[in-house]
Regions:
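Residue-level recognition of beta-strand microenvironments
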Residues: 44, 83-85, 98
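Surface-exposed connector loops and short turns at secondary-structure junctions
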Residues: 55-63
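Short beta-strand-centered aromatic/proline hotspots
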Residues: 39-40, 78-83
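Short, solvent-exposed secondary-structure boundary/capping segments
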Residues: 50-53, 86-97
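Short acidic/polar mixed-charge low-complexity motifs
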Residues: 35-37, 72-76, 89
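Short conserved beta-strand and strand-loop elements enriched in small hydrophobics
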Residues: 26-32, 62-75
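Short, charged/polar, Gly/Pro-enriched secondary-structure boundary elements
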Residues: 99-104
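N-terminal helix initiation/capping motif
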Residues: 1-46, 54, 107-115
Length: 115
């Protein structure tokens, strides 16, 4: 118990590191069966984001196509899967198939934004 309080590392399984995440607002768009939707991203990491959308919330597991996030360094185009959807609030997107260029630009932006 004293070791935990002092911040000593625990023995056993190492903890999985959580992805770096920034909590800022960015405009975004994505394509649904009904056309282009507009909303804002409130949390962003290398593995996903949270989109606040009161009107258009896809069900869990649905593919989010052509997601474009407008960052100060330029827009990034991504795709992913909707998770943790809450109607009238928003949903998380778990990114899939990120190309190397997008990964590098997203990583560089997140590193700078966390300083």
């Amino acid at each position: 118990m004293l070791q935990r309080w002092l911040g000593a590392p625990k023995l056993g399984k190492p903890r999985r590191q959580r992805p770096q995440r920034i909590a800022r607002y960015f405009d975004c768009t994505w394509v649904t069966a009904w056309g282009e939707e507009r909303a804002r991203v409130s949390s962003l990491s290398l593995t996903g984001c949270y989109i606040e959308s009161r009107f258009s919330v896809p069900p869990d597991g649905e593919e989010v196509r052509d997601l474009t996030i407008a960052l100060p360094t330029g827009s990034v185009n991504l795709q992913g899967t909707a998770v943790n959807a809450t109607s009238g609030v928003g949903f998380a997107v778990r990114f899939i198939d990120i190309d190397t260029k997008t990964q590098k630009s997203l990583s560089a932006f997140i590193s700078v934004a966390q300083r």
